[in-house]
Amino acid sequence: MTPLRKTNPLMKLINHSLIDLPAPSNISMWWNFGSLLGACLILQIVTGLFLAMHYTPDASTAFSSVAHITRDVNYGWIIRYLHANGASMFFICLFLHIGRGLYYGSFLYLETWNVGIILLLATMATALMGYVLPWGQMSFWGATVITNLLSAVPYIGTDLVQWVWGGYSVDNATLTRFFTFHFILPFIITALAALHLLFLHETGSNNPLGISSQPDKIAFHPYYTVKDILGLFLLLLMLMSLVLFSPDLLGDPDNYTQANPLNTPPHIKPEWYFLFAYAILRSVPNKLGGVLALLLSILILAMIPALHTAKQQSMMFRPLSQLTYWLLVMNLLTLTWIGGQPVSYPFITIGQVASVLYFTTILVLMPAASLIENKMLKWT
């Protein structure tokens, strides 16, 4: 008798995506992050839903409603910290997932890669708006600084900022609309993730060797379901360690002070996962130039397939390209560190050098390394 999963229309869909899916036999733990991102998304939606039941998106009560969740709601503290630190885990998995794609040449699956970039932008927008909701000092001033970047748009900039704010400053109208978008965007992200998977299953997964895996495939279940569950447990171990031992490690102490438009914090900075882009923004003295550099630091990912000059897909057997890749990783870590430092010497100079190096590595060094490798292997 044919199993139900192969006959029922709904079960058939799940079966083809998660159970009988033919997968390459040699994919490593680096291929775990897709499923971990799915788990993070579910966690964020569930915890966010429970937080939304008790949160009030009003400038006069938002801060105290978060305090109420932490103090008075049953297990409110763990729901809140799971949501806040879950976002950090989400971005760690996201960066590792993108890093894997860059290293193993997964960006050559254009549709999947482009939907992935849209997913990254949507996730960043969601996280930014979520950071505003507790209505602490860093929430308020972070929102003010980041939304103010729109004023750099020529001619319509000021009108654009006031349109986003819903007034002449970040206030109640801003908070209400940010809450609305923060609530709806994760569901849009879920739809985009389904699209991401749809495009991926059109081509099949890449593998570390960067060669065709058509001759040698295995069923996704039980081999990769077990592997993914192991990854999930490791992720939960990290997340729960963070939540239960040092829940405020990645947060900002200023956010425990209620938003005050008359008092500016000494160092305004976004959450840690935006610091690399923030450092690039601050490195350009001109406002419009800074905003363009900020946008390009993310959108440059869309140019990666066009900059691929190598004759091999994966970097596994390309030592020069590996060198440029790890240079890029170190550079991003440097930018993240600089983004959290005050705007003073020597941090300004380090930030500017790192920003130039970031774009140079992607636009010049990586394609050049690939061309040299082609010559060395006589693959011209």
Swiss-Prot record:
One of its GO terms (biological process) is mitochondrial electron transport, ubiquinol to cytochrome c. It comes from the Eukaryota. The gene is MT-CYB. Binds 2 heme b groups non-covalently. It is found in: Mitochondrion inner membrane. It is a multi-pass membrane protein. This is Cytochrome b. It comes from Hylobates muelleri. The keyword Lyase does not apply. Its main location: mitochondrion. GO terms for cellular component: mitochondrial inner membrane; respiratory chain complex III. It holds the Pfam family Cytochrome_B. GO terms for molecular function: metal ion binding; ubiquinol-cytochrome-c reductase activity. Heme b b566 binds at residues 97, 196.
